[in-house]
Amino acid sequence: MKFFIDTANIDEIKDALAMGMVDGVTTNPSLIAKEAGEFTDIIREICSIVEGPVSAEVISLDYDGMVKEARDLAKIADNIVVKIPMTVDGLKAVRTLTNEGIKTNVTLIFSATQALMAAKAGATYASPFVGRIDDLALDGMNLIEEIAEIYSNYMFDTQIIVASVRNPLHVLNSALIGADIATIPHKVLSALASHPLTDRGIESFMADWKKKENK
């Protein structure tokens, strides 16, 4: 399974790159708004340090606006993927952009039928939001299972990006289900590398080593 990092923060991206954990980057308007600088400058810098796909989201909600923005975004770098919201106009935009060879990531997916429609429209990626589904006391990972089964049944090329990842268990379950990608916030990525027994083991080894030095 590939790891994308869900951030627009350059320092977080560089830190994850140093761990060898960045197969791609996803951003959204909320993440971009947290960073200093112009939108296109931030995206351009991310694309310059990351070899894999970099998702940048349109702001417009109408078909014409989304297509225009998407074409402009695609000119920034070859590894740009345009994020399009899961709406009727969004699906129309995805169809047009796919025919033009522009890669797309349909975002804000909350049902298997939405994911099916995204795939039929030709989306490169589909992003179901598991954490937000869990917030409603529903099972976000069950949605990933449904989408994975549908895509397998009909051999869609669309890849599943598990989004709205809140904890390491989301990542583990995504891998067990067979999702293509999980897009992970930096803090969750760091948590994946941690375990209480690892910490205890290190403390024990260091304590034993100090005893040897003091002999």
From Swiss-Prot:
Pfam families: TAL_FSA. InterPro entries: Aldolase_TIM, TAL/FSA, Transaldolase_3B, Transaldolase_3B/F6P_aldolase, Transaldolase_AS, TSA/FSA_arc/bac. It catalyses: D-sedoheptulose 7-phosphate + D-glyceraldehyde 3-phosphate = D-erythrose 4-phosphate + beta-D-fructose 6-phosphate. GO terms for molecular function: aldehyde-lyase activity; transaldolase activity. GO terms for cellular component: cytoplasm. Transaldolase is important for the balance of metabolites in the pentose-phosphate pathway. PANTHER family: FRUCTOSE-6-PHOSPHATE ALDOLASE 1-RELATED (PTHR10683:SF40), TRANSALDOLASE (PTHR10683). Gene3D superfamilies: Aldolase class I. Its EC number is 2.2.1.2. This is Probable transaldolase. It comes from the Bacteria. HAMAP family: Transaldolase_3b (MF_00494). The active site is at residue 83. Keywords: Cytoplasm, Pentose shunt, Schiff base, Transferase. Belongs to the transaldolase family. Type 3B subfamily. One of its GO terms (biological process) is carbohydrate metabolic process. It is found in: Cytoplasm. Pathway: Carbohydrate degradation; pentose phosphate pathway; D-glyceraldehyde 3-phosphate and beta-D-fructose 6-phosphate from D-ribose 5-phosphate and D-xylulose 5-phosphate (non-oxidative stage): step 2/3.
